[in-house]
């Protein structure tokens, strides 16, 4: 956890870049004065150029219209991202995610609202990470049993389990 303070964020980003292949950042992407993460990330990447994404603006306008909320300049800020960022469209809220790649490190900035972050992770971040790092697709299955203890079941399937490939656990 890092304070919403410019120097703390910059230091954390520098340290993370030295140690990690993937850095996940949550929160601070909103339109209020205390949401400084987007601005600080742009500074970290030495990126003064801002790109306005009309698709984000249109999405926010549609969302606000649905709830009869006026669209204003503060909201327009949500659709402006640093030029080095790849837009990760957030269909569950107003703050889009951002994907950066620099010096062999991926940085992903996502909104701090848990369900919005989960949506971005599921539909944008994890698929990109799998592709970028050539990760295998993992299938997880749970087998429910009853009436017999774990040790008895383990004994019954031991021969079969021993023949499974090493990548199956």
Named regions from a protein language model:
Residues 22-28, 78, 82-83:
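Short, basic, helix/turn surface patches
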Residues 102-169:
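An accessory alpha-helical subdomain
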Residues 8-18, 36-43:
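Glycine-rich loop at the start of a catalytic domain that most often binds anionic cofactors/ligands
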Residues 35-132:
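Proline/glycine-rich low-complexity loops and linkers
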